[in-house]
């Protein structure tokens, strides 16, 4: 189950599609800039 926007994460794989794990604190899922 993937993490949604602003969800806590350890790496990009934790986040849902089009989201990436922020490299610096707080480690949350943010939009990665993609649409497809």
UniProtKB/Swiss-Prot annotation:
InterPro entries to which the protein is assigned, alphabetical: Huwentoxin-1
Subcellular location: Secreted
Record-linked SUPFAM superfamilies: omega toxin-like
Disulfide bonds: 2-16, 9-21, 15-29
Protein name (database record): Mu/omega-theraphotoxin-Pmu1a
Superkingdom of source: Eukaryota
Record-annotated site: Important for interaction with Nav1.7/SCN9A: 4, 22, 24, 31
Species per Swiss-Prot/TrEMBL record: Pterinochilus murinus
Functional summary from the UniProt entry: Gating-modifier toxin that targets both voltage-gated sodium and calcium channels, with described activities on human Nav1.7/SCN9A (IC(50)=5.5-7 nM), hNav1.6/SCN10A (IC(50)=9.9 nM), hNav1.4/SCN4A (IC(50)=62.9 nM), hCav3.2/CACNA1H (IC(50)=955.4 nM or 63.5% inhibition at 10 uM), hCav3.1/CACNA1G (95.1% inhibition at 10 uM), hCav3.3/CACNA1I (90.8% inhibition at 10 uM). Acts on Cav3 currents mainly by inducing a strong depolarizing shift in the current-voltage curve.
Signal sequence coordinates: none
Keywords per UniProt: Calcium channel impairing toxin, Disulfide bond, Ion channel impairing toxin, Knottin, Neurotoxin, Secreted, Toxin, Voltage-gated calcium channel impairing toxin, Voltage-gated sodium channel impairing toxin
Family membership noted in the UniProt record: Belongs to the neurotoxin 10 (Hwtx-1) family.
Free-text comment on this protein's domains from its UniProt entry: The presence of a 'disulfide through disulfide knot' structurally defines this protein as a knottin.
Tissues expressing the protein: Expressed by the venom gland.
Keyword Phosphoprotein: no
Gene Ontology cellular component list: extracellular region
Classification via Pfam families: Toxin_12
GO molecular function: calcium channel regulator activity; ion channel inhibitor activity; sodium channel regulator activity; toxin activity
């Amino acid at each position: 189950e993937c993490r949604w926007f602003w969800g806590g994460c350890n790496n990009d794989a934790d986040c849902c599609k089009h989201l990436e794990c922020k490299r610096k604190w707080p480690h949350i899922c943010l939009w990665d800039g993609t649409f497809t």
